């Protein structure tokens, strides 16, 4: 809806580990340009060690934030990139309950913040990329 010419939503998806400051920055830069932030945090780090959840509760009351917790261990403690991919897949599964096929969804690392000016009235040339 924001920055788009139709009724579709722009959804920003990230995995979260422990950098609350980075998410705070991302949220404040993009909040006027993105319709929804979808975050997935795991109870395990990418080496499969149990960790505490670090996402700040102040964001849980934001209408624009959907937060999901992956609460099962990763199958392999040595394949950190595969474990991150599992976390993203879990995020994608949960997107099915909140996104529509008309929505535009982008995944990035939490520290890869898009330039918000590029999200204003942008034109999509292809749905997937």
PLM feature spans:
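N-proximal low-complexity "stem/linker" segments adjacent to membrane-targeting elements
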Residues: 2-32
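Short loop->beta transition adjacent to catalytic acidic/histidine clusters or analogous donor-positioning motifs
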Residues: 10, 30-43, 62-66
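Catalytic phosphate/metal-binding cores of nucleic-acid and nucleotide-processing enzymes, i.e., regions
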Residues: 13, 93, 126-128
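Active-site-proximal specificity loops/subdomain of glycosyltransferases
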Residues: 45-102
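Short beta-strand-to-loop acidic/aromatic patch adjacent to the donor-nucleotide binding site
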Residues: 101-113
């Amino acid at each position: 809806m924001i920055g788009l010419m139709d009724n579709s939503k722009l959804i920003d998806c990230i995995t979260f580990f422990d950098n609350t400051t980075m998410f705070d920055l991302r949220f404040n830069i993009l909040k006027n340009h993105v319709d929804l932030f979808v975050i997935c945090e795991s109870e395990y780090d990418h080496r499969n060690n149990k960790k505490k959840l670090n996402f700040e509760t102040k964001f849980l009351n934001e209408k624009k934030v959907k937060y999901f917790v992956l609460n099962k261990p990763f199958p392999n403690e040595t394949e950190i990139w595969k474990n991150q991919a599992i976390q993203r897949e879990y995020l994608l599964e949960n997107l099915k309950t909140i996104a529509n096929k008309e929505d535009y969804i982008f995944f990035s690392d939490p520290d890869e913040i898009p330039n918000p000016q590029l999200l204003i009235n942008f034109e999509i040339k292809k749905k997937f990329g």
